[in-house]
Amino acid sequence: AFSTFTATYQVIPEGTDLATYFEENAVPDEGLTTMLCYDLQPGGEYTMSKSVDFGNKQVTLRTTSISNHAKLKLTADNVSIKTGTIFALKNLDIDASQSFDPLISLSTPDESIKGTGDYYIVRGALTINGCNITGVNNNLIYDGNKKYCYESVVINNTMAHLTLSSQTNVSGNAVIYFKGGFANTLQVSNSTIWNTGDSDSKYFVQYNNSGRATRAGYNNSNVNFLNCTFYNIAKTGQWANYGGFNGQKCSYFDVERNIFVDCGNKQVIRRILGGRSASSYDVVKTQFNTYMFDGEFESTGGIVENYDVTGNCLETDPGFKDAKNGDFTISGSAQLENKTGDPRWIKTAE
């Protein structure tokens, strides 16, 4: 497949500790206005021995090979990747198992981006694309309790194996946790996220309850889950918590072709819609979702009353091959027929 890549700014030699590298090679001021792409070598092994804070500089850490990822291992218990602006991780295998801090944490904001509603507004995306992340003991993304409004947070074509730990506070918050602010658009697509830790998050996504599109100068917000597989997250909690979105005409939702198993206390779509009926919003798209919890379904006759009302919820077991060990290959006929969940688990017969 042909893929276009932004020009390389620097190639970082394999075997490098990225903490040392960025101490010795500070991101230049060019990064204030231009995305700078740092390439890790295909198949190369890298470490990060302490947190790296990119602040207000736009950085992509990536492997240019989509088939031979560089491997990045966090090597201390308090390592986070920090940013306060547009940022991306692409085509990386990340081992976060030694760190008990959030994988991505937002920096002290640059005062110059303070805007409508006193939000620190980042006009661009925080992106995780094409990554395989293991050993996430704490939040995947945390806003550092700063009043950020990111235009978008995008997770695509990524596997994130959470090992949520009782040594952190994650049981009281979320996998994607904006304590001070919110993401105006959250899009999770073509991805698999699951938890096998000794703890669990209370929510998959949580924003500060004041967060709302119009309060930060946007016309509408979006929460989009598209072709994803989710397993064993917020099992006794709630999938989503963002009081400022609830029942607002400016809140848009798109939830299509996902498989949720043992998530969100059998109320996934209800919580995505903030406990308000689909009819209370201008834009709610739902189709071909599976909501299975302890072998039962949220839906009856293809409908979750008031919430997923298109009429085509799937009520067959997706038949994961070995969920406990991270193999979510599906065997469920309805899921195969409608090509649902993360596409990587739809295996065609040889």
Features from the language model and the residues they span:
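Non-catalytic propeptide/linker segments at domain boundaries
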Residues: 1-9
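N-terminal extracellular ligand-recognition/capping segment immediately after the signal peptide
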Residues: 13-27, 32-59, 66-77
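Extracellular beta-strand solenoid repeats
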Residues: 39-41, 47, 60-62, 73, ...
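Extracellular beta-strand-rich solenoid/capping regions of secreted or surface-exposed proteins
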Residues: 45-60, 71-122
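Short glycine/acidic-rich loop motifs that flank beta-strands on beta-rich extracellular proteins
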Residues: 48-51, 75-77, 97-105, 136-144, ...
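Right-handed parallel beta-helix
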Residues: 85-96, 117-137, 149-167, 172-199, ...
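Predominantly extracellular beta-rich ligand-binding scaffolds that present long acidic/polar faces
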Residues: 196, 207-321
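C-terminal accessory segments
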Residues: 308-350
